[in-house]
Amino acid sequence: MLPFVQNIPMISIWLCVLGGLCCLMLRAHAAKILSLLMCCTQVVLSAVILTHTLYAGASFNYQMGHFASPFGNELRAGPLEALLALCISVVMLLSLMGGADDLKLDIPENKRSNYYIMTSLVFAALLVIIYTNDIFTAYVFIEIITLGACAIIAIKPGGRTLVATMWYLIMSLIGAGLLLFSISMLYGVTGHLLMPGLYESVAVLAATGQYTLPLFILTGLMCAGLGIKCALFPFHSWLPGAHASATTASSSILSGLVVKGYIFLIIKIFVRVYGIQVMDMLHITDILLILGVFGLLFGFSSSY
């Protein structure tokens, strides 16, 4: 039997899902209280995992179901994952608390419970992206984030909000298509979806020189897909409209959590799927450096 602390990642995810389902049956004020209590509980649970992993000095895997790796699915929790989960929980709590007054002005009372349902689903999906050890599971919950993010934008009445939501949805679907295509290509050349298996297979392919061109192409598609979803340069122009049209709490969640969740997934894939040596061999780091410099110059020139 696993120690209780190793069950916390799964408990945290299901807590958000169940909290969202409970909000479906509650009035606006009760749904707000439940969401805030859920966020506070997540802060405590994430702090427990962080303390445990720091003192243990190692991460742990949580096997989902009866099938072990590489056939089953699993979660992975270490100090970095626990710290990010703690930060996400705190930001979500502060966003809902800070934007509570504006929600009363921007959203009709009969729709506010729906708002808290969507924020709970976004919260759960972000935790899955942090903890998952499976790249396809990350893709599935990225789409849940997309649907939840569109909902918390569109729930504010107004034509401008609907236009911004449609732009957000269209660009997110383009990014999702590129990401799914790259994941299917990666599965085709490696035969794995779990990150440890992908890391070993990619290292072998890089060492033997096999599938170098497909590996380079799928990496570019993956970066482009996630870059579009998190509005990295040069795919940034569509995002400000969505943030400006949303309510205060939604804008805070989108900019402080959703975008950062995609960026964390990019870093996670680079480190735990490719590794620094393979990235250097494929010149991915050089391309990222060039794009970063151009983004810096573009941002500097656009500020005037």
Where are these regions (language model features)?
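Amphipathic repeat-derived elements
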Residues: 14-16, 43-44, 144-146, 228-234
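Short linear sequence elements within intrinsically disordered, low-complexity coil regions
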Residues: 65-67, 72, 144, 173, ...
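Residue-level recognition of transmembrane alpha-helices
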Residues: 12-16, 35-38, 88, 119, ...
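Hydrophobic transmembrane alpha-helices and their helix-loop junctions in integral membrane proteins
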Residues: 94-104, 121-136, 148-304
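Transmembrane helix-loop-helix hairpins at membrane boundaries of multipass inner-membrane proteins
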Residues: 1-11, 18, 22-117, 196-203
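Short acidic-aromatic active-site loops that bind/stabilize oxyanions
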Residues: 84, 114-115, 143, 287-291
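Cytoplasmic juxtamembrane interface segments
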Residues: 14-29, 147-163
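Alpha-helical transmembrane segments and their immediate interhelical/interface regions
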Residues: 1-21, 129-149, 212-220
